[in-house]
Structures are given as C-alpha cells and as structure tokens.
Amino acid sequence: NLILPFFMLDKRYPQMKNAWTHYERFGAYPALTDESMDENDRYVWLDTYVKTYLERDVRDLVALRDLEPYMKLQRAIALQTGCLINVSSLATEIGVSSKTVKQYIEYLNVSFQTIILPSWERNQQKRLVKTPKIHCLDNGVLQAILHKRGGMTGNEFESLVVSEIYKQANNIRANVN
C-alpha cells in the first residue's frame, strides 16, 4: 500500500506543485508569471535581465570600465551560492585583489543580487570572526548567470530557502542578522 503525505491529499496540491516548480526554475520576478510566456520566453527574459543589470545598473552604480572581472565574480559566486566566502580564493580565481572582490561583493549586496549571512554563534564576538556565507537572492537569476535550465544543487536550494526567509523578515522589518 502507498501511504501519501498529508499535503499531497490537498486538492490544491497540483497547483502548489506547479507554482513551486516554476519558482524553483524561474525565480520570483512577477513578469515571469505571465501565462502568455512559454519556458523559452522566460529564459530569454532572465538572460536579458542579467545583461541589463550588468550593462546599465552596475555601470551606473560603480562606473566600472571593465565588466569582465565583475562578471567572473558574479559567476563564481553563483557557483558557490550557499557556501562560505573565501575572498582570497575568489581574488586568485578572478585575477583581482581581495579589496576589489570585497567591493564587488558589496555591489552585489547593494543591488539585491546577493546577501551575506553571518555565521550563527551565541557569542557576538565569535560571530564577527567566523566566515559568513553568501547567497544569491533569486534562483531564476542564478540559473541565468550559470546558463542552467532547471535542476538545483543542495546549496542552490539552501540559498532559495535563505532568500525567502530574508525577504519575509525584511517585509515585516525583522532583524535578519
């Protein structure tokens, strides 16, 4: 006999499952819920969003002359979402200074592409010295940066959950650090 979990018995389960699958693949931008868009249209929208973010928003925010190192960092962080941040390793990988990596990470945070999640320790002093994690805030954008079309790693799932908690906490103005 097959015993189903309670939530699967709910009449709304198929709709909830479809909504979850959509969210997992395309993220949370409202434009992507347009029912006239097919799957390919949504991927094109996400790719365009990432390009617009780089070409217009980042240039306006920090006046970068060369976007290549920034794009490399953005991709490296997307690959490492949900992981501890190692600034030195990222600097070596991208070919820039640690100071530049820290600036770029700050730009990603200010533009709501990522958040830094401090390690959790009861002792506030320890919390300051422990290595934080970095999380991408939108799974659809993450997928576009990595040129993926579905599928999710454990770290990507962790980032999806962390980003939702972060958004909900910010919505009610709770301190999320």
Regions found by a protein language model. Give the residues of each.
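Accessory nucleic acid-recognition modules appended to NTPase machines
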Residues: 33-177
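Amphipathic alpha-helical "lid/sensor" segments that cap RecA-like P-loop NTPase cores
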Residues: 6-49
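Alpha-helical sensor/transducer elements of the RecA-like P-loop NTPase core
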Residues: 1-3
